From Swiss-Prot:
Membrane-spanning intervals of the chain: 33-53, 77-98, 113-133, 178-198, 226-246, 288-308, 320-340, 347-367
Pfam families from the UniProt entry: Cytochrom_B_C, Cytochrome_B
Protein name: Cytochrome b
A GO cellular component annotation in the UniProt record: respiratory chain complex III
Single GO term (MF): ubiquinol-cytochrome-c reductase activity
Higher taxonomy: Eukaryota, Metazoa, Chordata, Craniata, Vertebrata
Organism: Microtus townsendii
Domain of life per record: Eukaryota
Protein function: Component of the ubiquinol-cytochrome c reductase complex (complex III or cytochrome b-c1 complex) that is part of the mitochondrial respiratory chain. The b-c1 complex mediates electron transfer from ubiquinol to cytochrome c. Contributes to the generation of a proton gradient across the mitochondrial membrane that is then used for ATP synthesis.
Gene from which this protein is expressed: MT-CYB
UniProt miscellaneous comment: Heme 1 (or BL or b562) is low-potential and absorbs at about 562 nm, and heme 2 (or BH or b566) is high-potential and absorbs at about 566 nm.
Family designation: Belongs to the cytochrome b family.
GO BP annotations listed: mitochondrial electron transport, ubiquinol to cytochrome c
Subcellular location: Mitochondrion inner membrane
């Protein structure tokens, strides 16, 4: 068996990636989220495939086909709710995975980090298009509002929006193309994940100390396979509790009303995992400025390696930057809350303050904190 595992051209790739991979001996549970994201992606692709067998991407029948899946298809309700809540679990793992990368300075592995940012954008695009497919009120109006933002692009904006819509409003053509893209993107994401792993295995994993761990490596299997399996069990437990007991808790009641272009819902808002970016978008009175801030709220992650001023890689031994980091986490939670609130006083002011704080902490305060720590420790 060992001979096959190490010699077979296909199996040896798996062997070098998941079995004989040298891994740092001290990586904590924060390193579990990569495998959990892989699991989420597999769940989403499988449930999505079975949903696509029964779904129809036509404005006249889309809403009814989802109702048909839930009522008439064997375990259709389970597949549908697993897919809907699977997206939420996916984003929880994504945010924790990115948060881990920021905390432990993993952004210094630039190729892996940039690939991760591309993956984040791809997953967000996929989730947005997926939300449009049930063709409820929030699906329709969410698609209208978000695609309309592209009209802020000078000169080509209006043409671009009509090209994406396939007409003069969100309609049948839009739904059909969104379904096509929503179906194909997860497979593209899978390919990008392999590239992400390829880049990671070029450098090896980071660890909580941020120090070189070449002198103290252990094989991935059995140590981290068993550790990942525990993470998988906990994730599946939480996932099934959410899906079976509270399937609609993260959804919007408006999406149980069929899409009606003549009736605007009182509060148009995206799914919870986009609320922080939506709050930043709404905080800027100018349309183009809002769109740029929205894109920058994610793209700013690409600047992280350039903004790293500390002589130490991780925040493990850096209490000042740690404080900044946790203020940033709190700020993101505030933005998420504000994104779900109506556009009125005091929420507008809170949102604007939190948006300024978000960019200021990353661009100004964390780099300054790093320099102060260098000074305190005489690392200059």
């Amino acid at each position: 068996m060992t001979i096959i595992r190490k010699k077979h051209p296909l199996i040896k790739i798996i062997n070098h990636s998941f079995i004989d991979l040298p891994a740092p001996s001290n990586i904590s549970s924060w390193w579990n989220f990569g495998s959990l994201l892989g699991l989420c992606l597999i769940i989403q692709i499988l449930t999505g495939l079975f949903l696509a067998m029964h779904y129809t991407s036509d404005t006249a029948t889309a809403f009814s086909s989802v109702a048909h899946i839930c009522r008439d298809v064997n375990y259709g309700w389970l597949i549908r709710y697993m897919h809907a809540n699977g997206a939420s679990m996916f984003f929880i793992c994504l945010f924790l995975h990115v948060g881990r990368g920021v905390y432990y300075g993993s952004y210094n592995m630039i190729e892996t980090w940039n690939m991760g940012i591309i993956l984040l954008f791809a997953v967000m695009a996929t989730a947005f298009m997926g939300y449009v497919l049930p063709w409820g009120q929030m699906s329709f109006w969410g698609a209208t509002v978000i695609t309309n933002l592209l009209s802020a692009i000078p000169y080509i904006g209006t043409t671009l929006v009509e090209w994406i819509w396939g007409g003069f409003s969100v309609d049948k053509a839009t739904l059909t193309r969104f379904f096509a893209f929503h179906f194909i993107l997860p497979f593209i994401i899978t390919a990008l994940v392999l590239v992400h792993l390829l880049f990671l295995h070029e450098t090896g994993s980071n660890n909580p100390t941020g120090l070189n761990s070449d002198a103290d490596k252990i094989p991935f299997h059995p140590y981290y396979t068993i550790k990942d399996f525990l993470g998988v069990l906990i994730l599946l437990m939480a996932f099934m509790i959410l899906t079976l007991f509270f399937p609609d808790i993260l959804g919007d009641p408006d999406n149980y009303t069929p899409a009606n272009p003549l009736n605007t819902p009182p509060h148009i808002k995206p799914e919870w995992y986009f609320l922080f970016a939506y709050a930043i978008l709404r905080s800027i009175p100018n349309k183009l400025g809002g769109v740029l801030a929205l894109i920058l709220s994610i793209l700013i992650l690409a600047l992280m390696p350039l903004l790293h001023t500390s002589k130490q890689r991780t925040l493990t031994f850096r209490p000042i930057t740690q404080t900044m980091y946790w203020i940033l986490v709190a700020d993101l939670l505030i933005l998420t809350w504000i994104g779900g609130q109506p556009v009125e006083y005091p929420f507008i002011t809170i949102g604007q303050t939190a948006s300024i704080a978000y960019f200021a902490i990353i661009v100004i305060f964390m780099p300054i904190a790093g320099m102060i720590e260098n000074n305190i420790l005489d690392l200059d």
